[in-house]
């Protein structure tokens, strides 16, 4: 069975791309913050990868699309961390890679749960609300 077509796919894709843009900005541009709790930065690494991953896994629901996205997000997590030493403000940390992977796993899990239909339901609500 094919997943339903989203009426505002272009809008959701644009918002997802903005999420990836924000992730890259955090990885390479922004100056790191001083965290007060131990391993707090690992939480933010996981969150920064979970949100765009879950978004795109909700946006593309076919099996091959999700698997391709999974590979893309895994590569982004790995190479993003490996390239961080090229930035003057960031350093390489293998535990950050694990936090990134945990975030992608969380995004995958959320997209395969009941939460994974939120985007579809919201799209249907907006499409029916503004239909002429």
Regions found by a protein language model. Give the residues of each.
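Bulky hydrophobic segments
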Residues: 1-132
């Amino acid at each position: 069975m094919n997943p339903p077509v989203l009426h505002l796919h272009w809008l959701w894709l644009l918002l997802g791309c903005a999420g990836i843009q924000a992730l890259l900005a955090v990885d390479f541009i922004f100056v790191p913050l001083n965290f007060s709790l131990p391993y707090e930065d690992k939480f933010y690494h996981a969150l920064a990868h979970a949100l765009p991953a879950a978004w795109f896994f909700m946006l593309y629901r076919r099996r091959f699309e999700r698997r391709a996205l999974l590979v893309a997000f895994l590569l982004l997590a790995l190479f993003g961390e490996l390239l961080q030493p090229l930035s003057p403000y960031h350093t390489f940390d293998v535990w950050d890679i694990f936090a990134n992977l945990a975030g992608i796993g969380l995004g995958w899990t959320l997209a395969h749960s009941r939460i994974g239909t939120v985007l579809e339901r919201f799209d249907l609500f907006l499409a029916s609300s503004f239909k002429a």
